[in-house]
């Protein structure tokens, strides 16, 4: 922290965040995963070979939903991990989006559980998560997950809306 400003650096020593803002048009690596932001400083891609973390427990999420959503979040949103905590995904805004709590805790979690079983079975699992935005909103309308298990690719799209 210099002059009250917080600077955040990735695994390679590259600056990717200042205070509560991810830098625009930036690629950064956190815990072995590669992330990319767009011109608005929104995460547009998170990818890497999934690894199961080697410690128990879950650290507190570092950033508020307000900081992550920039005012575009909904009351029903969670701070959703792009790369799940069980895969050693970061617990900061560099790996988070405003995600509908029903989607986050049910369908998205079910996919993470399925992928964790594949990793535990010794399979090579690579994932690319791409939030899809409309306009300049920091809340994605959907999340596209492309995953490859031992060379076989699949795609799932999760609308970021609660089913009525």
Which residues make up each language-model segment?
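Domain-level detector of nuclease and nuclease-like folds
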Residues: 22-164
């Amino acid at each position: 922290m210099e002059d009250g400003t917080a600077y955040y650096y990735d695994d390679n020593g590259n600056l990717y965040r200042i205070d509560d803002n991810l830098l625009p048009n930036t690629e950064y690596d956190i815990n072995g995963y590669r992330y990319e932001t767009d011109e608005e400083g929104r995460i547009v891609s998170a990818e890497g070979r999934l690894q199961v973390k080697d410690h128990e427990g879950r650290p507190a999420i570092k950033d508020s939903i307000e900081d992550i959503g920039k005012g575009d979040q909904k009351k029903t949103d969670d701070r959703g991990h792009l790369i799940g905590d069980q895969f050693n995904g970061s617990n900061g805004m560099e790996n988070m989006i405003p995600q509908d709590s029903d989607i986050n805790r049910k369908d998205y979690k079910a996919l993470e559980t399925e992928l964790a079983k594949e990793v535990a079975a010794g399979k090579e699992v690579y994932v690319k998560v791409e939030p899809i935005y409309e306009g300049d909103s920091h809340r994605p309308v959907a999340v596209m997950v492309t995953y490859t298990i031992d060379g076989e690719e699949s795609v799932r799209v999760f609308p970021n809306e609660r089913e009525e």
